[in-house]
């Protein structure tokens, strides 16, 4: 009886560990910039570039322009930039979500999804960013960290803000092309 109980407990622990290992980026939820809870599952099957953004950073202009161009060029082909404002680095995103959205849309005409301001590091970090940091081995240390997420939700690349969007673009484009070819084969 004791052996059966121990075996059952071990089996439950093993199953729980396996279930945790199966988690991916698209399993999380986040609040969008307008306050609505969104399942990131809606982006499954697409390539995503997840970025922690800030409005008052030295990297803001270069990154926002390049991210919007990337969204414009690749968005029609199962790709999304997913922007998460963050005020943890240099207090460079101090405004409200409404002001952040207004700034991004007015200044850069952003058309990519934006989410509510979050923490991306530390104990209060959003679970999706904890996942990105743990699976890539690279935790954000400043604004405009970029994580490339495959259609299956797995992280396939991570870059700090000194790496430009243009430098990352070939890897993103290759992943999008691969996805397009797979979708064509399914027809």
Curated annotation (Swiss-Prot):
Question: What GO annotations for molecular function exist for this entry?
Answer: catalase activity; glutathione peroxidase activity; peroxidase activity
Q: Which CDD domains match?
A: GSH_Peroxidase
What InterPro entries does UniProt report for this protein, alphabetically? Glut_perox_Gpx7, Glutathione_peroxidase, GPX_AS, GPX_CS, Thioredoxin-like_sf
Tell me where the signal peptide lies. Answer: 1-19
Which Pfam family, just one, is annotated for this protein? GSHPx
TM segments? none
User: Which superkingdom, per the lineage?
Assistant: Eukaryota
Q: Does the keyword Membrane apply?
A: no
Reactions catalysed according to its record? 2 glutathione + H2O2 = glutathione disulfide + 2 H2O
Where, if anywhere, are coiled coils annotated? none
> Which UniProt keyword terms apply here?
Oxidoreductase, Peroxidase, Secreted, Signal
Q: Name the disease.
A: Barrett esophagus: A condition characterized by a metaplastic change in which normal esophageal squamous epithelium is replaced by a columnar and intestinal-type epithelium. Patients with Barrett esophagus have an increased risk of esophageal adenocarcinoma. The main cause of Barrett esophagus is gastroesophageal reflux. The retrograde movement of acid and bile salts from the stomach into the esophagus causes prolonged injury to the esophageal epithelium and induces chronic esophagitis, which in turn is believed to trigger the pathologic changes.
As for what it does, the entry says: It protects esophageal epithelia from hydrogen peroxide-induced oxidative stress. It suppresses acidic bile acid-induced reactive oxygen species (ROS) and protects against oxidative DNA damage and double-strand breaks.
Similarity annotation: Belongs to the glutathione peroxidase family.
Q: What is this protein called?
A: Glutathione peroxidase 7
């Amino acid at each position: 009886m004791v052996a059966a109980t121990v075996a059952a407990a071990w089996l439950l622990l093993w199953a729980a560990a396996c279930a945790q290992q199966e988690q991916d980026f698209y399993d999380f939820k986040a609040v969008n910039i307008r306050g609505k809870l969104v399942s990131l599952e809606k982006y499954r099957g697409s390539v995503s570039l997840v970025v922690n953004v800030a409005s008052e950073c030295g990297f803001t202009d270069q990154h926002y322009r390049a991210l919007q161009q990337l969204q414009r060029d690749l968005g029609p082909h199962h790709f999304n930039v997913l922007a998460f404002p963050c005020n943890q680095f240099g207090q460079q995103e101090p405004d409200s979500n409404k002001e952040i959205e207004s700034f991004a849309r007015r200044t850069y005409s952003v058309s990519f999804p934006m989410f509510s301001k979050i923490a991306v590091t530390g104990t209060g970090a959003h679970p999706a960013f904890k996942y990105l940091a743990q699976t890539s081995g690279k935790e954000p240390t400043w604004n405009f960290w970029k994580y490339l997420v495959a259609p299956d939700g797995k992280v396939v690349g991570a870059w700090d803000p000194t790496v430009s969007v243009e430098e990352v673009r070939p890897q993103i484009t290759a992943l999008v092309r691969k996805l397009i070819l797979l979708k064509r084969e399914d027809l």
